Regions:
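Repeat-mediated protein-protein interaction surfaces in helical alpha-solenoids
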Residues: 1-11, 24-37, 89-90
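TPR/TPR-like alpha-solenoid helical repeat scaffolds
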Residues: 9-10, 52-61, 77-97
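A conserved position within tetratricopeptide repeats
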Residues: 10, 36-39, 43, 72, ...
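Generic helix N-cap/helix-start motif at coil->alpha-helix transitions
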Residues: 13-19, 43-48
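Inward-facing hydrophobic residues that define packing positions of alpha-helical scaffold repeats
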Residues: 20, 32, 39-40, 68, ...
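Residue-level signature for tetratricopeptide repeat
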Residues: 21-25, 53-55
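Acidic, aromatic-enriched beta-alpha/helix-loop junctions
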Residues: 39, 45, 49-56
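TPR/TPR-like (Sel1-like) alpha-helical repeat modules
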Residues: 43-45, 57-79
Length: 97
C-alpha cells in the first residue's frame, strides 16, 4: 500500500491498523486532537514517533524532543509534510512486510 492509498482509506478500514498508523491517518484528515488522543497514553516506539511529530507540528518543540527520545528516532529536520509522509511510509512498510 502506498501513502496515497493509506490516506484514502476510510475510518472503518483504519481501525484494523496499529495505533500509530490510526493516529497518523487522523492527522492526514486534519484532526490533530483525535490523532493525539489516540496515542497520548500509548507506550510503543512507533506511537512515540507520531507523538513527537504531532508536538512538533503544534510548535511544542520541548515536548517533541522528549517523544523523539522515547521513539529512538532523531529529531526531524524535514518539513512537517515530508516528516509525516516518511513516518507513514515506514509504518505502512511495517504492516505490509
Amino acid at each position: 500500500m502506498t501513502v496515497e492509498e493509506f490516506i484514502k482509506q476510510n475510518a472503518e478500514q483504519i481501525k484494523t491498523y496499529p495505533l500509530a498508523l490510526q493516529a497518523l491517518w487522523h492527522d492526514y484528515q486534519e484532526n490533530w486532537h483525535q490523532s493525539h488522543s489516540l496515542i497520548d497514553t500509548a507506550g510503543d516506539k512507533d506511537s512515540a514517533w507520531v507523538h513527537a511529530y504531532l508536538h512538533r507540528k503544534e510548535g511544542d518543540i520541548g515536548n517533541a524532543r522528549y517523544w523523539y527520545r522515547r521513539s529512538g528516532k532523531p529529531e526531524s529536520r524535514l518539513s512537517l509534510s515530508r516528516e509525516r509522509q516518511e513516518i507513514a511510509r515506514v509504518l505502512i512498510q511495517e504492516i505490509t512486510n
